[in-house]
UniProtKB/Swiss-Prot annotation:
GO terms for biological process: queuosine biosynthetic process. The gene is queC. Pfam families: QueC (PF06508). HAMAP family: QueC. This is 7-cyano-7-deazaguanine synthase.
Length: 226
């Protein structure tokens, strides 16, 4: 069994990678650079995680178009990365328009060429930033798209093993699978020491705190979000 895993280097994609490895898949790891502020640090995390799981087949793709399109504080340096508002129902400025569809398109192309029948992605729906392309119905629709846009004998299905989990449950799952959380990177602002106040840092810190486990990475400040 062969599978492509979309591996950003964050905690959700790390745990998803661990789940896929635990299921016995031969993994091919895909990493997308799209002009994000922490691009270099995320790539380091990707390589460390691949090394940990001994993933030999790796593909790094550069997406210039998402940063050229802009509209996100992750890719547009003129837009500030906002401080986390975890109870807000608004989609944060860190949303990159239709990012997952762009990434999944590459994953499907690669999967079809190398004969992988699964694509794993660490999307989280319920306990996350509220990005529209992380919803269950989005991935259901994309699976239908794959059926209609690939060769008749191609059988590729997207797997989202953590999509319905709370973030703290993802931490617990990761601990059960003995994942190297210290190799992962979630901060949207900094490539050196995690800021502790962006949306991604806040969600991560809250998850570890709710799980009763100290996050092993270093933070500039480490607020409580409970």
């Amino acid at each position: 069994m062969r599978a492509v895993v979309l591996l950003s280097g964050g905690m959700d994609s790390l745990v998803t990678t661990a789940i896929a490895a635990h299921l016995g898949y031969e993994l091919a790891a895909l990493h997308i650079n799209y002009g994000q502020r922490t691009e270099k640090r995320e790539l380091v995390a990707f390589q460390k995680i691949c090394d940990f799981y001994r993933i030999e087949r790796r593909l790094e793709i550069n997406f210039e178009h998402l940063s050229l399109i802009g509209g996100s504080s992750l890719t547009d340096l003129a837009m500030p990365v906002t401080t986390a508002k975890l109870h807000s129902k608004e989609i944060p400025t860190s949303y990159v328009a239709f990012r997952n569809a762009n990434m999944l398109s590459v994953a499907v192309s690669w999967a079809e060429v190398i004969g992988a029948n699964k694509i794993f992605i660490g999307a989280v729906d319920e306990d996350s930033s509220g990005y529209p392309d992380c919803r269950v119905n989005f991935f259901q629709a994309f699976n239908e798209l794959i059926k209609h846009g690939t060769k008749p004998d191609t059988r590729i299905e997207i797997q989202t093993p953590v999509i319905s989990l709370k973030k703290w449950e993802i931490v617990i799952k990761g601990m059960e699978l003995e994942v190297p959380f210290e190799h992962s990177w979630s901060c949207y602002k900094s490539e050196h020491v995690a800021c502790g106040v962006c949306d991604s840092c806040a969600l991560r810190l809250r998850a570890f705190e709710q799980a009763g486990i100290r996050d092993p990475i270093e933070y500039k400040i480490r607020p409580s979000y409970i």
